[in-house]
Amino acid sequence: LNTAKDIRGDLPEYLASFEYVNGGLFTNSFNSPRFSTKSRKMLIECGSELDWSDINPDIFGSMIQAVADDEERGSLGMHYTSVPNILKVLNPLFLDDLRDQLKEAGGNGRKLLNLRKRISNIRVFDPACGSGNFLVIAYKQMREIEAEINSRRDETDRHSAIPLTNFRGIELRDFPAEIARLALIIAEYQCDLAYRGQKLALAEFLPLDSENWITSGNALQLDWLSICP
């Protein structure tokens, strides 16, 4: 999964057929955990019987919180913030203004283009991002506004001008930091699927970009300007 197809060499067909993922998700090798008969059966059922195409990255935060014990949650400040509460911050911060500008632009092509350029330059930073819920919601809301702009300009097939690297975060622990990055990748794919169609979404999804925009470290000790260029 971390090796391009043209340099994989001699591999069994069932391995060679896997897509090249890249993006650092499969860079390292890990020892496989030992599964009991029951846990193996449950894992297979999760992979084969559940529909993962509609997985909601918004809930990753609550999932992480659910598997952590009470003491760990308290010491690390792991408190899941719901989508409505996140929007209470994002809406007055900049989303309401973007929606007002969209309403004012109407069908004016030049104003719509200027608004799209503005959206593409907005940077969102969360110095305690956890599993990325705040960043994911911000990204999805901005993609929704961009999709309306593209629709009014009759450019629904257009590649998004909002890069994931505009959404930066710092998280103390490695695992939630990786979850935050994965959640944003899933959000990008789902937005492409919703606004551009399955063909374009699948064609451009893989391989993933290897750049990492979620930093694992102590936000009180890091230089924020170096993390948010």
Description of each model-found segment:
Residues 1-97, 192-202:
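Non-catalytic, mostly N-terminal accessory regions of nucleic-acid modification and defense proteins
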Residues 65, 69-229:
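SAM-dependent methyltransferase catalytic region
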